[in-house]
A protein has these predicted regions:
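Positively charged n-region of N-terminal signal peptides that target proteins for export
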Residues: 1-4
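Hydrophobic/aromatic-rich core segments of domains that either
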Residues: 25-34, 47-48, 176-184, 189-196, ...
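A short, amphipathic beta-strand motif
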Residues: 316-325
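Secondary-structure boundary elements
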Residues: 41-42, 49-220, 254-256
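Short amphipathic beta-strand segments in non-cytosolic proteins
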Residues: 330-349
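Short Pro-Gly-centered beta-turn/loop motif in secreted/extracellular proteins
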Residues: 354-364
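C-terminal motif of bacterial Sec signal peptides marking the signal peptidase cleavage site
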Residues: 14-15
């Protein structure tokens, strides 16, 4: 579930971005890096003889000023950092009791924002770029454009989780599953991995008062929707599947909801990690009453300044250049009432009030 803290941070980021940054050039991004500039220049120097990887590195660096890690942890009375390993507890209530006892002993919770442009080093970025290109060569990823690769496979983060260095491990863990499944495209590869998620992940509150890390979700195998989506996005990108996180704020319930979407042939297909694949989750979003979103927003890595965001005096996360309203990208299902239930027979596209289904024949 999303929290007000996340919305507050996004609002702060948005306000700064709108007021000070009208699109960032490579040189502007480097100038924002401060002492970390030398690390970013090492990346550019490393790829100077590889034009396509150099452009990928430039893409990451240009957009790094908009991204950060949300770091949260306990600080002991002696000033030492501590984060409980939830695998060492029987359940989330035991984790909560442990955290409560820490605060009774004088531990405090510290929250800080660490900006990527000032913190990520050259070896981390080079490793992620090389592994992303390696994944892009897989058969199910071969038809993905360079633009699609940069936006949905290359990025080293999904949202505001602490930057993870798990791409290699996740690739080695999940790649054999797709290879053995002989996936022909990203959609099929996503189906295979999401079925494995059913064994690896479970929707469950951790009891931890902190924003989840990719590592914690993978090791413990539990998390709420934001944790599962962040992990699923990074796991799928690690094996060359173009995936993003999408969100909505509930209008009749507390908090919000996240799910993922995979890119196939220019269209995004929704799926819920460890719950429903891209062949069925959009139908659930449209037909299950409590899942129907009022608005759908896609989390971007590259800041979008094309759409006008007039300054009306209000600071809101909805103005973030990292959010794209994709409510209009609605797929619809043509269903037949078959044996006492509606069953989908075709997927179409909705444009305003018109729904289009192709190649539907027969009358039985």
């Amino acid at each position: 579930m999303k929290t007000c803290f996340l919305f507050m941070i996004l609002s702060i980021l948005t306000s700064c971005a709108i007021q000070k940054i009208k699109g960032v050039s490579l040189e502007q991004a480097l100038s924002m890096a401060g002492e970390n500039r030398a690390e970013l220049e090492k990346v550019l120097e490393y790829y100077k003889n590889d034009s396509i990887k150099l452009e990928a590195a430039r893409y990451l660096i240009r957009n790094m000023p908009f991204h950060f890690s949300r770091m949260e942890y306990f600080v002991s009375p002696e000033g030492e950092r501590y984060v409980p390993d939830i695998r060492n507890f029987t359940d989330n209530q035991a984790v909560k009791r442990h955290c409560d006892s820490l605060q009774e002993k004088g531990y405090t919770i510290r929250k800080e924002i660490v900006y990527d442009i000032k913190a990520l080093h050259s070896d981390y970025l080079i490793r992620n770029i090389d592994l992303a290109f390696q994944a892009w060569q897989k058969p199910w990823a071969k038809d993905i454009s360079f633009e699609g690769f940069c936006r949905y496979i290359l990025p080293y983060r999904a949202e505001v989780e602490p930057a993870s260095d798990m791409r290699q491990e996740l690739m080695e863990y999940y790649l054999p599953l797709i290879d053995s499944g002989k996936a022909r495209n990203a959609f099929e590869a996503c189906m295979i991995i999401n079925k494995q998620f059913i064994n690896d992940l479970k929707y469950k509150e951790t009891g931890q008062p902190f924003y989840p890390t990719v590592e914690e979700t993978f090791r413990a195998g539990i998390g709420e929707c934001d944790a599962l989506c962040n992990f699923a996005t990074m796991a799928m990108r690690a094996v060359g599947i173009p995936v993003v996180v999408q969100t909505t704020t509930w209008t009749k319930m507390d908090l919000a909801h996240s799910w993922c979407a995979v890119l196939q042939d220019g269209e995004f297909y929704d799926f819920s990690p460890a719950y429903a694949g891209p062949d069925e989750y959009r139908q659930k979003l449209m037909t299950v009453r409590y899942l129907k979103p009022a608005k759908v927003y896609r989390n971007l890595f590259d800041a979008d300044f094309k759409k006008s965001r007039t300054d009306d005096g209000y600071t809101t996360y909805l103005k973030s250049p990292l959010l794209k309203d994709v409510t209009a990208e609605s797929l619809v299902y043509l269903c037949a009432y078959n044996y006492y239930e509606w069953k989908p027979v075709a997927i179409g596209i909705q444009t305003d009030a018109v729904c289009e289904f192709k190649d539907v024949v027969g009358n039985n």
